[in-house]
A protein has these predicted regions:
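Active-site nucleophile and cofactor-binding loops and adjacent substrate-binding regions
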Residues: 66-69, 88-91, 115-123, 142-148, ...
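Short glycine-aspartate micro-motif
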Residues: 4-8, 16, 62-67, 145, ...
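Glycine/Thr-rich phosphate-binding loops that ligate phosphate moieties of nucleotide
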Residues: 1-30, 67-105, 279-285, 296-484
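N-terminal phosphate-binding loop and adjacent alpha-helix
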Residues: 26-61
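Short acidic, glycine/serine/threonine-rich loops at helix termini
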Residues: 76-79, 156-160, 164-172, 227-231, ...
């Protein structure tokens, strides 16, 4: 049996899955936590990676490994390969002003044309501008910029700070992949190149813009190298005669798409703390409104994506208000009729990104003596959650993305009411895969690709399928309050 490993280095934790290359069956898993916060010392990710690999039984019998991870995080290195300051993560919003400044300077249309996306505070370019404006001494020391998975891959291959790694600070050995590079706002999915002029204009006042080392973007099925001779893994030969192959890696959403086996016509709707709606397409997508981020995927195609701030927490809030758990919330919701008796929850509890209403608050419309029941409130919560995600699906469709099936994933997807009502709201058949670590699974699949030169043909087990159950009243009510 040939084994391959995949890593999901997310905001909250590091998860490792070891799979059988031939069948895709999970052989063993491991996990370790990450510290909380919106800025984190990358050393904590390395510690967690080592712990998660150890928890998963180590690498002695593994032939290849690949790392997928949270996108956008800014890891800045000096000439000795040392991290200059804690990494600013995707959810650190201090660079919102920098994002607005960049849009004012270049124009949304030009930025979308050059990089596929209009930058928001999440994106790496805005964080570099913030660094230049607010920490000029740190900005002046920057010799290289990497993303979280880039840095972990570099370290796993044996590179790192001078005196603390077997191969030393060879910055030119930093690598990334198309999917993660596309979230920087200085790499173009359409051309496959860095926009050095844009980066220099945004960060060049530090005197380092034109000199920065940026990770080499390698092909999806290529390999970045092999696991280095590290103290943490003293016998890195693994199951292969030439060492453990290290794959290109990927951004987390691209990793999930790869793990799910998403194909043209599939739209992935992921319901976590926030929500994402994305699809694999054959052509690059640009959206000057900024609603759709024109990312690349992990196979050589493209991954247009829409994000919402409010997702599973909507159910948390309403379940808490009703004094029930999530399962009972779903039971209550399915007792009510589509449209919730006229109750409509506009669920902007944390403001919203799609549509762009950062200062909005949640509002419950249509409360009457007849409509205000526990059942209707429970269903209004689920309908509001899904209508917000349907806005994302609509934005993708407006950019030419076709949807013949929804792949509904995330913890909330396991709630029976969410699946049923999704088939009413999206007006597209809904498939709910078996629960799994699909980001790590995608990384493992990519590791197999790097090892053999062929993308493993693993299948995704579908737990539940819902046919279309059109309930037009839900969308009509939601659109009516949105336009009021």
């Amino acid at each position: 049996m040939t084994l391959v490993a995949g890593v999901d280095s997310s905001t909250q934790s590091c998860k490792v899955v070891v799979r059988d290359l031939e069948t895709g069956a999970t052989v063993r898993t491991g996990r370790a936590s990450h510290p909380d916060g919106t800025e984190v010392d990358p050393a904590a990710w390395w510690t967690a990676l080592v712990a998660a690999i150890t928890d998963a039984g180590g690498l002695d019998d593994v032939a290849a490994i690949s790392i997928a991870g949270q996108q956008h995080g800014m890891v800045v290195l000096d000439g000795e390969g040392r991290v200059i300051r804690p990494a600013l993560l995707w959810n650190d919003t201090r660079s919102a002003g920098a994002a607005a400044d960049l849009i004012a300077e270049f124009g949304a249309a030009d930025l979308a044309e050059r990089t596929g996306s209009v930058p928001v505070a999440s994106f790496t370019l805005t964080k570099l501008r913030w660094l230049q404006q607010n920490e000029p001494q740190n900005a002046a020391r920057v010799a290289a910029v990497a993303l979280p998975h880039d840095w972990l891959t570099w370290r796993l291959r044996g590179y790192g700070p001078a005196g603390e790694s077997p191969l030393g600070p060879v910055l030119a050995e930093l690598t990334t992949d198309r999917s993660d590079a596309s979230g920087t706002s200085y790499w173009s999915p359409a051309t496959g190149t860095y926009d050095r002029a844009l980066l220099d204009a945004a960060f060049g006042n530090s005197g380092k813009g034109h000199e920065l080392v940026l990770p080499t973007v390698i092909a999806p099925g290529a390999h970045a190298g092999t696991v280095g001779r590290l103290p943490e893994f003293p016998t890195p030969a693994g199951a292969g005669a030439t060492g453990i192959v290290v794959g290109a890696g990927a951004g987390d959403n691209a990793g999930a798409a790869l793990g799910l086996g998403a194909a043209a016509g599939d739209v992935v709707v992921s319901i976590g703390t926030s929500g994402t709606v994305f699809a694999v397409t054959e052509t690059a997508v640009r959206d000057e409104s900024g609603t759709v981020a024109g990312f690349a995927d992990a196979t050589g195609l493209f991954l247009p994506l829409v994000a919402t701030l409010n997702a599973a927490r909507i159910l948390d809030v309403v379940a808490g208000l009703l004094g029930v758990g999530h399962e009972e919330l779903g039971t209550l919701a399915l007792t009510a009729e589509p449209g919730s008796g006229g109750l409509v929850l506009q669920p902007y509890f944390e403001g919203e990104r799609t549509p762009n209403r950062p200062d909005a608050a949640a509002t419950l419309f249509g409360m009457t003596l007849a409509s205000t029941t526990r059942e209707n409130l429970a269903r209004a919560a689920v309908e509001g959650l899904l209508c917000g995600l349907a806005d994302g699906l609509g934005a993708l469709r407006d950019r030419g993305v076709s949807a013949s099936r929804i792949l509904l994933v995330g913890g909330a997807a396991q709630n029976a009411a969410v699946g049923v009502i999704a088939s009413e709201v999206f007006d597209v058949p809904v498939s709910i895969p078996e629960p799994g670590e699909y980001v790590a699974a995608g990384a493992a699949r990519q590791a197999g690709w790097a090892l053999t030169g062929e993308l493993p043909a693993w299948s995704t087990a579908i737990a539940v399928e819902h046919p279309v159950r059109t309930a037009a009243v839900i969308g009509e009510q939601y659109r009516a309050v949105a336009s009021a």
